[in-house]
From Swiss-Prot:
A Gene Ontology BP annotation from the UniProt entry: protein catabolic process
Native source species: Schizosaccharomyces pombe (strain 972 / ATCC 24843) (Fission yeast)
Keyword Mitochondrion: no
Keyword Phosphoprotein in annotation: yes
Identification of the protein by name: Protein kinase gsk31
Amino acid sequence: MSDDSHLETKVVTDGTTGEKKTISYEPCRVLGSGSFGVVIQAKLVGTPGFIAVKRVLQDKRYKNRELQIMRAISHPNIIKLIAFFHTHNPSKDETHLCLLLEYMPETVFDDMRWYTRRRKSIPNLSIKLYAFQLFRALAYLHSTGVCHRDIKPQNLLVDYKTGILKLCDFGSAKVLVPSEPNVSYICSRYYRAPELVFGATHYTTKIDVWSAACVIAELFIGRPLFPGDSSVEQLVEIIRVLGTPSYHEISVMNPNYVNHSLPNVRPHTLESVMPHNCTKNAMDLLHKMLTYVPSKRISAIEVLTHPFFDELRDPNCMYHCSRDEGTIERHLPPLFNFNLAELSIRPNLNKAILPPHVYESLDVDINNFEPIVVKQADADS
């Protein structure tokens, strides 16, 4: 470590217990920046690894949704909030929120780029690993009432060596209340569900499923599935693959949508745009996720039961990252260490999700347990 003059010492609030404590960290490098603020990598004194520090400007008119939600949730495939603190600049009358977060070395976007630059495809097993962990995180998140609203490759942190994935960036996340409207211009364009493109303000967590499906397709293709440069172009891209939605489908997505003059585009099929390494099971799963009517779109917990993931349920399955030199094989990262809250989401699906060889390692008897009501995140956000 360099000299102590680079250290920043702060009184922070623990992200789990709420207790105050003093920590010191040394900023290392900028990981990302944008309208939201900046994220840096830092070395936390007294620990062997790194953390990420996210600094965002506070709007005094609102509680910070991201902080509220991150304090309310906890999951192996969601980035952990270690601690947080506020800073105030009197001269500018500005307050910033600083989140100290678990650090991961890359994003799914970075991993994809490594392969595409070498004109290679991400191995199917890696796609299955990333997809399973993403939908496991979403199944838990949705069970708490929270919708992420910005699923994209840049918000999926990974360690390609171990295959572990964690969902991050809850800056757009919100507890969805059925009776309350939401903004429709949410989510990065390539990953926006069609009901959002049609301007719906009453939508469900199924928008995350659509976005995640777009990410899975992109992992196979190596580029975005629906790369629209505007809202109209986004709709054209979707119609080009899935065909024109019927008036009934449009009215279900947004009953208030009145402009029924849709682009006249000659449709392809999903099969025609997906590469040869996209298996029959993968194609079937994509079809179940990429449907216009949200209620017909498969849910995140249901996705986990799909045969596409059966290879991961094989106790002899080993993970080999083709980015590694040599032929290092590793055991899969923990995929089935479901806690009681996860087992309680849809108890009737547990045996379709979890392979028999993990039953004994669970904290509960999968054949005889009392499901709990999953704690809902605070909607006052």
